[in-house]
């Protein structure tokens, strides 16, 4: 997490289980860099069993820290969802297969909700009945081994702003038996 006025850390979770999974992660990171975000750190790539909907291929997951000082959070969300769509993401089955998934996990110490102010033309795949399109920190961050393991690798002392526990503490306390293993160590 950053503390100066020259940067703002945003942690992004990436996941893929369709096609060339490694290439999908690499392409997503290159596209994120193409938005002008500086990728500060990237975790190893983890192979993880599906959560929720099990009849699908295993995922590759990774977490990156990016400097998003010049981005409003909803504009960043929209840009990330455009990357997902351009890479072929379709939202058909909740927790189902995907070419790429990019979740905003944390935005420095920000805690709050953002509501939908976009029209259907802006992003027709989003249909949130509650009107809430983004909650920070991610509401299931502390419940998912496939997110916490790579996040702890790059930021073990990062504090969850609501739970007031470090990523390492959250991972140690996690009651999630899902299989998460390093697929490719970071270089």
Segments the model singles out, each with a brief description of its role:
Residues 2-12, 18-99, 107-113:
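Nucleotide and nucleotide-moiety/phosphate-recognizing core
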Residues 51-58, 74-78, 82-187:
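Flexible, gly/pro- and Lys/Arg-enriched active-site loops
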